[in-house]
Amino acid sequence: MDYTKKILYQSNYWYNDGLRKAQIRDMSGAVTSLRRSLQYNRENIAARNLLGLVYYGRGEVAEGLVEWIISKNLKPRDNVADYFISEVQESASELEIINQAVKRYNQCLVYCSQNG
């Protein structure tokens, strides 16, 4: 087995390990394995997308977006990262709408307390 195949094998091994850990919700272990996979092959799109998804699942949205954007740059066509990025962008606009409603509600409470 030549050197390149060994590196790809190692990358796939760590990706599969990260996938198993993500399936049982061991998110910290999944991050470690997926990062190791990317150390062997930084162009492992599946590992990069899964790492982004794990970050997103942990509430680290910015880190997830970074991984998906890198993935999108490495493989511009037919990449599931497009879906993840668009979902985050859509949820960000929904979050902003909710945030504005909360601000208005709080302002109404201030007005009520001033007249009471």
Residue ranges and their predicted role:
Residues 1-13:
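TPR-adjacent "capping" and linker segments in tetratricopeptide-repeat scaffold/adaptor proteins
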Residues 5, 38-39, 70-73, 110:
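Conserved structural position within tetratricopeptide repeats
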Residues 23, 57, 90-94:
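Register position in tetratricopeptide repeats
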